[in-house]
Amino acid sequence: MHVMRLSIHRLRRFQTVELHPASALNLLTGDNGAGKTSVLEALHLMAYGRSFRGRVRDGLIQQGANDLEVFVEWKEGGSAAGERTRRAGLRHSGQEWTGRLDGEDVAQLGSLCAALAVVTFEPGSHVLISGGGEPRRRFLDWGLFHVEPDFLALWRRYVRALKQRNALLKQGAQPRMLDAWDHELAESGETLTSRRMRYLERLQDRLIPVADVIAPSLGLSALTFAPGWKRHEVSLADALLLARDRDRQNGYTSQGPHRADWMPHFDVLPGKDALSRGQAKLTALACLLAQAEDFAFERSEWPVIALDDLGSELDRHHQARVLHRLVSAPAQMLITATEIPPGLADAGALLHRFHVEHGQVALQAPSD
């Protein structure tokens, strides 16, 4: 898929900006603070329903404005015969998000997220590796969400059961009142876990070759999965029953896929905790690129790839390795930098450049 039009209204420093990116390589340059990241942030908002730079109240809406709007028009479909144009709009009124997809209001933003797939690497992406389990669970679920049509319904089923069980636990409900939700949680949770495990196994096969190319010094060798309970010993139904008294005391559910995690393993390092910040960023980027490749294989089309401030996140050597790998893929890429990255210096006509300055985005001629 590739974005044909991105319109941004009243987001951070932008009053009104419209961008028509090319279907291949797009580089947005400008000084620090010019607004390059905000362009990718707008695209990320549409694809994820949230910003990677904080909450709405952290300055997402332009100062003095009451709302913000983002519009995206893109083509999707793995072949010319199946290609179609999609259009989506997202608005925050200052109180809540609302969205439209192909001319219809959407009841949930998940409909927008399911329609437009964007893989984003930004300065905070290292938390995928160095942070807690939540971003890693979200990473797995994003991949499943986009390649398995029924996954969202399964995930919602589990989350609903978890919320109901936790509410009963906080109320100090009698044990028999938990039985129905324990059954629902166990049934949906076992299926959810099996899906996650299969996906991670498949992702590992794609990740190791990617990591060997962009960061061979890491020696990334495997991904291991922790399901959120001792699955090799007991079923989830039994784990919930065994933990019931403790859960009633604590007021929350301690066992299940909402506690799951996964970890990378390395031949030359003792574990993810031994990684430097730069190594964590490289590992995270390798995971994201492997996920993009898996999406492309399963869906017969690439997601949009957004790389923010690559120059400050990676040294020139690793930038060149990453971009060399990406240039060979038929994916649309939007990259921000203060100058042309070393891996794109010879891109020639393949590279479409935009300059961001004073709240405006302008297409640059090849000779600029």
Curated annotation (Swiss-Prot):
It holds the Pfam family SMC_N. ATP binds at residues 30-37. It is found in: Cytoplasm. One of its GO terms (molecular function) is single-stranded DNA binding. Keywords: ATP-binding, Cytoplasm, DNA damage, DNA repair, DNA replication, DNA-binding, Nucleotide-binding, SOS response. Transmembrane segments: none annotated. The keyword Iron-sulfur does not apply. One of its GO terms (biological process) is SOS response. PROSITE patterns: RECF_1, RECF_2. GO terms for cellular component: cytoplasm. Belongs to the RecF family. PANTHER family: DNA REPLICATION AND REPAIR PROTEIN RECF. This is DNA replication and repair protein RecF. It comes from Xanthomonas oryzae pv. oryzae (strain KACC10331 / KXO85).
